[in-house]
A protein has these predicted regions:
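Long, C-terminal-biased catalytic regions of enzyme "large/alpha" subunits
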Residues: 1-90
Length: 90
């Protein structure tokens, strides 16, 4: 990496206070589980909404809450099944 580039690696603060690299695959797997067998919902829509609100060293607990909030914010008259995704994440 040259001096003109920013390091875009984000980190997660675990409950014990240690940090680790943010792993989008872990988030994706949780969302795949939460959306399994629910029609009319999209893992990528939840990821996009949540990604806007992520920041470096975010606590792991906040990521969980953010996924719930992101799914809940997608609930509408046309996409009511996000309520079931949010419920699974709780």
């Amino acid at each position: 990496m040259n001096d003109g580039q920013l390091n875009m690696t984000m980190h997660v603060t675990k409950r014990n206070g240690s940090t680790q690299d943010f792993d989008l695959d872990k988030v994706h797997k949780v969302l795949e589980w939460a959306t399994a067998d629910i029609s009319g919902v999209s893992v990528s829509e939840i990821e996009i909404k949540a990604n806007i609100q992520l920041y470096d060293k975010i606590p792991a607990y906040d990521i969980h809450e953010l996924l719930i909030k992101s799914a809940a914010e997608l609930i509408s008259e046309h996409t009511p099944n996000y309520q079931f995704v949010a419920a699974r994440l709780i």
